[in-house]
Amino acid sequence: MNKYFKVFFFVLLTHALKSALIFGQATLQKGLSLDIDKDSKATDRLVVKHFDSDKQGYKAYTFKKEGWEYVNVKHVYFGERLLRVGRDQDMKCDYVHYVKVFWKGELAPFLIKMKYYNWAWVSTRLHFRLTPELTWAEVFVPTIDENSEEGYMKLFKKRMDDFVSQVGEDRLATYKPFTEDPSKKRFDLTPTDEKEDTNKKKYVLMVVVVVVFVVVASLVVFLVKFCLK
């Protein structure tokens, strides 16, 4: 009886530890958390959701909070090649371009869609408030030599530079500069490290599972011995 119980105890303990590890790994997929201090009284926690579409060739970070919608449009991914929208440093203008690249089958020409996002009060200047009243602008970009990647990318870059410049000039002609409203609190975003906190939770959960299991196993042993008497 003792031998079988030890085997049973070992199997249950192994299963409990395995379940705890799997659960702990799953909690790592929360994404980036941001602390927003809107009223200088309490910090509001929200989670950034990550959307990735290789077929359409873009990545964007979006999050919503109390009717506000923001999107991080710093990088646009084109296959395995990374194209940058804006600069590595802080944006110098109060609007930003969001580009989605589409392939048309095996043909070299592709479609670019562009949409504007007005900058809101965010300290990093990488997040922008969505303005849904602005519509998409579609551009058809032909290529010089669809068999030459170098020529293709050069033309793409030139057409993109020209297009962004043209749209930017048209937009700035009617653009009203953003004015700070003293009655509204500035949004201060500070990225926090979720991994360290998640690891602590994982190990605490493992310890709790093991302790509970040992207590239950001890109780079972006591009951078995009591019944055998």
From Swiss-Prot:
Cytoplasmic side: 225-229
Keyword Ligase: no
Cellular component per GO, a single term: membrane
Membrane topology of the entry: Single-pass membrane protein
Protein localization: Membrane
Main location per the UniProt record: membrane
Stretches that traverse the bilayer: 204-224
Keywords, comma-separated and alphabetical: Membrane, Signal, Transmembrane, Transmembrane helix
Extracellular topological intervals: 20-203
UniProt KW DNA damage keyword: no
Span of the signal peptide: 1-19
Protein name: 23 kDa piroplasm membrane protein
